[in-house]
Amino acid sequence: MKAKPSHPAFSMSTSLRVSPSIHGYHFDTASRKKAVGNIFENIDQEALQRLFRNSGDKKAEERAKIIFAIDQDLEEKTRALMALKKRTKDKLFQFLKLRKYSIKVH
């Protein structure tokens, strides 16, 4: 009986290889959607709120308002969204800490 090879990568077929450029083939990127700077460019505020709400976001309206604020530049929007995320995380920690102390007291 022959032992099986210890390196299965050598017996891999050409159809399972990751890079098509080995054989001179190229990925077809012409049909891909072009990247945009603002991913929320073609969406209205209500649809964005619905998207956030459906994903379980408790502050969907506030988050959508931050994104659609016209007077803020990109850095201000990023800071506002990060602050909103931090406040949510802080409230969670406060809740967990309060729960921990209430269990010890009783």
Curated annotation (Swiss-Prot):
One of its GO terms (cellular component) is cytosol. Its main location: cytoplasm. Keywords: Apoptosis, Cytoplasm, Nucleus. It comes from the Eukaryota. GO terms for molecular function: Notch binding. Monomer. Interacts with NOTCH2 (via ANK repeats), the interaction inhibits the nuclear translocation of NOTCH2 N2ICD. Interacts (C-terminus) with CBY1 (C-terminus), TCIM competes with CTNNB1 for the interaction with CBY1. Seems to be involved in the regulation of cell growth an differentiation, may play different and opposite roles depending on the tissue or cell type. May enhance the WNT-CTNNB1 pathway by relieving antagonistic activity of CBY1. Enhances the proliferation of follicular dendritic cells. Plays a role in the mitogen-activated MAPK2/3 signaling pathway, positively regulates G1-to-S-phase transition of the cell cycle. In endothelial cells, enhances key inflammatory mediators and inflammatory response through the modulation of NF-kappaB transcriptional regulatory activity. This is Transcriptional and immune response regulator. It comes from Bos taurus (Bovine).
